[in-house]
Regions:
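Alpha-helix-loop-beta-strand connector modules within alpha/beta enzyme cores
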Residues: 76-100
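Glycine-rich, proline-tolerant flexible connector loops at the mouths of alpha/beta enzymes
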Residues: 34-35, 61-83
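Conserved, mostly hydrophobic/aromatic
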Residues: 27, 57, 122
Length: 152
């Protein structure tokens, strides 16, 4: 028996329907992304790429500020946060209703994105293996389901 929760996820208080495929469009704000054509640096480039993602039918914009390509430059947590702040400020201004995911493997970066910009999805390519605080951070910002609240 399927339950309602198996087809939806809570994204900042709204349900995102996953009973049908949901495409996630990638927005790289790194100067050294694997694919040169995906490197967005200016407000105009970021805005245009976000609009393209949505126009092509994606339900989620996944923004990343740390390249995962082989031999990519190591970026400090501070630099990753500054890049994301710039990108997220642009997205919140130009596409306020868009569902935003942040691609990071760092718990501190994820925390900043949730606290300062209300990001509801964290996309960690390392699945918590590169930062032992990632699971704790995600759990801290996960709303309990009504069923879990009843058990407390």
């Amino acid at each position: 028996m399927e339950t309602l929760s198996s087809k939806y996820i809570n994204v900042n208080g709204s349900l995102l329907d996953l009973s049908v495929p949901c495409v996630m469009g990638i927005l790289n704000i790194t100067p050294d992304s694997f694919y040169a054509g995906s490197r967005m640096q200016t407000e105009a480039e970021i805005t245009a790429r976000a609009q393209q993602i949505l126009d092509e039918g994606a339900g989620i914009i996944d923004i990343g500020a740390y390249s995962s390509r082989p031999n990519a430059e190591n970026v400090s947590p501070h630099e990753e946060m500054e890049r994301l702040r710039m990108g997220l400020e642009i997205l919140r201004k130009t596409h306020p209703g868009a569902v935003i995911s942040v691609d990071t493997f760092r718990a501190d970066v994820a925390r900043m994105c949730v606290e300062e910009y209300g990001v509801a999805i964290i996309n960690d390519i390392a699945a918590g293996e590169m930062d032992t605080d990632m699971f704790r951070t995600c759990l801290l910002y996960t709303s309990p389901s009504p069923r879990d609240t009843e058990r407390s």
